[in-house]
């Protein structure tokens, strides 16, 4: 029997998603389409009459703006919001800023898929000569991180390793206390939570594509195990198209 409900949403399309570039920790804006996706997600939540008590997001504006759109569209702007770097997207290291299709043409689709989808193989690290090094590694929003916490690149395994402690220590107690939680974050940090909730294998989580801007609903029992598969809020066609679009990103044009 379900005793808790959790809602998660991957941010709407960003300008770099639109350009098919590896985004990671670069603070890209939502595209026009991404803004519309966030508003559509808000409408789906409003239509489902869902209310929340506390919200969590990353420190990247594409996720924050998605959350804002949902809170605005559901008239819940007053809710407390916790922002944390631990829910950031996976750090794509030296690939940050590169067009995925061009990278596939240069290195081969298989290598790009390994970098994007392998569980424990990180991309090349971002060094000090990288054009986005200063705007990420020297950014004051990360000034409070302890030595060794700021990544220069991450595998999916690394991303999950820094997201899950926040889930376990901060979010889980709120859910167990009966709070209705909304998380607006990124494809890979959310994958970490999904993998943990569903007990998925490393291989299975690599194949999971979370669509942008479409709310994901979990009904959980008191042990925080799903009582049924994840549900998407939205019409079937919207969900199917979104998941196909995500899967197609790493292919050479």
UniProtKB/Swiss-Prot annotation:
The record marks 186 as: Transition state stabilizer. SMART domains: PGAM (SM00855). Expressed in the heart and muscle. Not found in the liver and brain. It comes from the Eukaryota. The modification Phosphotyrosine is found at residues 132-133. GO terms for molecular function: bisphosphoglycerate mutase activity; hydrolase activity; identical protein binding; phosphoglycerate mutase activity. CDD domains: HP_PGM_like (cd07067). Its EC number is 5.4.2.11, 5.4.2.4. Keywords: Disease variant, Glycogen storage disease, Glycolysis, Hydrolase, Isomerase, Phosphoprotein. The active site is at 11 (tele-phosphohistidine intermediate), 89 (proton donor/acceptor). One of its GO terms (cellular component) is nucleus. SUPFAM superfamilies: Phosphoglycerate mutase-like. Substrate binds at residues 10-17, 23-24, 62, 89-92, 100, 116-117, 187-188. Homodimer. Interacts with ENO1. This is Phosphoglycerate mutase 2.
